[in-house]
Amino acid sequence: MLQNTGKLAGCTIFITGASRGIGKAIALKAAQDGANVVIAAKTADPHPKLPGTIYTAAAEIEAAGGKALPCIVDVRDEKQINDAVEQAVEKFGGIDILVNNASAINLTGTLQTPMKKADLMLGINLRGTYLTSKLCIPHLLKSKNPHILNLSPPLNLNPIWFKNHTAYTIAKYGMSMCVLGMAEEFRGSIAVNALWPKTAIQTAAMDMLGGSEVGKQCRKVEIMADAAYAIFKQPTSFTGQFVIDEDILKKEGIKDFDVYAVEPGHPLLPDFFLDGQPEDLVKHMEAHGATPAFTTAKADPVAAGPVSEMFNTIRGIISPEMVKTTQGVYKFNLAGEHAGVWYLDLKNDAGSAGNGEPPVKADVVMSMDSEDFVKMFGGKLKPTMAFMSGKLTIKGDMGLAIKLEKMMAMMKSKL
């Protein structure tokens, strides 16, 4: 691994999304030099499924030798960012490095992506990066060797990286375009670069996309922390670069990359937006025991009807609370004009819903006409009446079927 040199001693680093994952790893690497770290993230209270808060991260940073300032920040909120910037300047005297790490991901096609999810990704990835940079730049300009580092991919305009998740790609490439523009705008004053991993990195987001078995195909977050550290050592003339973690570490003399592997010797999963094919990523994940929570298949015509619209709405209102209280996976075999198979997973991770077979075995299988399905989820047909009249057949856990009926009543006001 890359050794610390003390280069960042006394520097102030403002990191968004630093309560866990890659953001926290970068913070801890800098802390070993004695850096000041502003932890700008949303998680103030413990999350039921995700590790860490801004306060636990602060404690780890202090223990590693740095100084920490935990700030509750949603990067979509200009006031919260501005307050955090002001607190950082007041406590540490300025800002030397900004890391735009906060990000949201949803790998669904255009018809399957509710605007709520699209707005979330654009708001956090693109707008959040632009806004945080804008508010930090006046202070960065006063630093001796200022850097902005966006955790975003090279601008690979091959359509294969758009076709299955256009909204996510636009949002993520927006971060990369901030690099392209700001690097030129502030050339000679601030180094503005992007960093992206060559392979998948084990994070909560990766576990969500590939399931628990995907971890062994990943590298640890420390490789990204070391790569970021290598970038921060560069002068401001090193700017406008789209850096791949492994490439810059090779230039730093690192030869043994097995130390970064979650399971040394296991085949590694290439990351998105590089030279591979999306279909190959899915095959790689499946071949080594992971369960991809996304698809590379072309959009199905069935995804353009009223059933699809209903599922778009359902996706937009799935919440951790629903998953926690329901704990069931539902499969819907629909006949009629909009025939097809759909699923609703209110058991695993953050919950999911979509066209096709469920990612895991269904606890309940419901069969009915597509028109009746739309009526039922739209509140115009009671599930009990549909079942009693023979319009709905149910196989599996009846208790979970009843839970779904209760949930539909709660959903009715939101549909």
From Swiss-Prot:
Q: Which positions are catalytic residues?
A: Y168
Binding-site list for NADP(+): G17, A18, S19, R20, G21, I22, G23, K42, D74, K172
Please report the name of this protein according to its UniProt entry.
Answer: Hydroxysteroid dehydrogenase-like protein 2
The record ties this protein, via CDD domains, to: HSDL2_SDR_c (cd09762)
* Keywords, comma-separated and alphabetical: Mitochondrion, NADP, Oxidoreductase, Peroxisome
What's its job? Has apparently no steroid dehydrogenase activity. Might act as a metabolic regulator that affects systemic adaptation to nutritional cues.
Its gene is hsdl2
Q: Mostly located where?
A: other
Q: List the disulfide bonds.
A: none
Q: What class of enzyme is it?
A: oxidoreductase
Single GO MF descriptor = oxidoreductase activity
EC numbers for this chain: 1.-.-.-
- All copies of the SCP2 domain together span 304-412
List cellular component terms (GO).
mitochondrion; peroxisome
UniProt-annotated location(s): Peroxisome; Mitochondrion
Stated family: Belongs to the short-chain dehydrogenases/reductases (SDR) family.
